[in-house]
């Protein structure tokens, strides 16, 4: 039986969702000069850049954006055959900053746990918050996003795929069943 693909978010819905999320981040961070967005590779990075653009449009403030590679911090390294060099790029010390980790989908919470471990190597932030475009549930760790674009209850065997203009050439979120 062929997989069934259901569009969950259209390009317009993604745009509106990112605008709403940017507004929520602004509301929660009165001093935007202390804010840093860290996108988690792969699709968290372009999402973080889009959020920074939205914040700049709304508040005329440039927010620094970094990229974090959690590969070497994962607790399932034994299952990973190849280890790539870390692609982490953080533009400044995180000590005293208000960090928002940005990821496309949260599932079990293991990627976020790895990201938290990675962040502490770049300083001691004042606070770390989590923003995710899609929360599909099924957490194995006590991790809960502070900002969520869409809550999407799924079955364990289903997949959620996020496609973004950069790097995929289109904006859409799909649920894949079967």
Swiss-Prot record:
Top-level taxon of the source organism: Bacteria
Biological processes per GO annotation: regulation of DNA-templated transcription
Example GO molecular function: uracil phosphoribosyltransferase activity
Catalyzed reactions per annotation: UMP + diphosphate = 5-phospho-alpha-D-ribose 1-diphosphate + uracil
Enzyme class: transferase
Binding site for substrate: 42-43, 83, 103-111, 136, 160
Motif extent (PRPP-binding): 99-111
Enzyme Commission identifier(s): 2.4.2.9
Keywords: Glycosyltransferase, Transcription, Transcription regulation, Transferase
Keyword match Ribonucleoprotein: no
Signal peptide stretch: none
Cited function: Regulates the transcription of the pyrimidine nucleotide (pyr) operon in response to exogenous pyrimidines.
HAMAP family: PyrR
Family: Belongs to the purine/pyrimidine phosphoribosyltransferase family. PyrR subfamily.
Protein name: Bifunctional protein PyrR
Annotated source species: Synechocystis sp. (strain ATCC 27184 / PCC 6803 / Kazusa)
């Amino acid at each position: 039986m062929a997989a069934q693909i259901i569009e969950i978010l259209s390009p317009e819905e993604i745009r509106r969702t990112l605008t709403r999320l940017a507004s929520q981040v602004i509301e929660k961070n009165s001093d935007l000069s202390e804010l840093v967005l860290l996108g988690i590779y792969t699709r968290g990075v372009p999402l973080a850049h889009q959020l920074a653009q939205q914040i700049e449009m709304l508040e005329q403030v440039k927010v620094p954006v970094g990229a974090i590679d959690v590969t070497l911090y994962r607790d399932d390294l034994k299952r990973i055959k190849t280890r790539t060099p870390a692609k982490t790029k953080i533009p400044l010390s995180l000590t005293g900053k208000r960090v928002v980790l940005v990821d496309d989908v949260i599932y079990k919470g293991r990627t976020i746990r790895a990201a938290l471990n990675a962040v502490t190597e770049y300083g001691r932030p004042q606070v770390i918050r989590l923003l995710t475009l899609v929360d599909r549930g099924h957490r194995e760790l006590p991790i809960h996003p502070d900002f969520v674009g869409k809550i999407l209850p799924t079955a364990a065997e289903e997949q959620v795929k996020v496609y973004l203009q950069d790097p995929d050439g289109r904006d859409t979120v799909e649920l894949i069943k079967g």
